[in-house]
Design a protein with these regions (language model features):
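Conserved small/aromatic sequence motifs within transmembrane helices
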Residues: 1-134
Length: 134
């Protein structure tokens, strides 16, 4: 990923970023708004380590934390992670772990070609327009 936060942003350990987090630089706000901070992960898609669409991978610290706080959160780790997903186009950075899980599980259990086309088009619109997620 591209760096969107100031250096030493996590000097006190991993922290979940808020939408208006003061650790996010001005350039970081732009790359997050357009989601281009995710583009380096296209390499992971080409290598087969990620898919284009699927639940976004979380850092191990957050998976452990959220799995202990949100029943079923670890289930989203059972599928190949994706560069973009239903949770990202429905709420992006504003979602709580519970909300993210709801969208990820909907994609995992009810995903279809039409849903993938919808996610792809919405993702492209976010990148082109910079209009976040909703």
């Amino acid at each position: 990923k591209l760096r969107s936060m100031c250096k030493n942003a996590e000097k006190n350990g991993a922290q979940w970023a808020d939408k208006d987090d003061d650790r996010i630089t001005n350039v970081g706000k732009f790359i997050r708004k357009t989601r281009i901070d995710e583009l380096p992960q296209l390499i992971n898609v080409v290598k087969g380590e990620m898919s284009f669409i699927g639940p976004r991978p979380e850092r191990p610290e957050f998976v452990e934390l959220f799995s202990s706080e949100v029943i079923g959160f670890e289930q989203r780790c059972l599928v190949t992670p994706g560069l973009t997903g239903l949770a990202q186009i429905q709420g992006g950075y504003d979602l709580t772990p519970q909300q993210k899980l709801k969208y990820d599980m909907k994609y995992i259990h009810k995903g279809s070609l039409m849903m993938e086309l919808y996610i792809s088009i919405r993702t492209l619109m976010v990148v082109i327009t910079g209009e976040g997620s909703r």
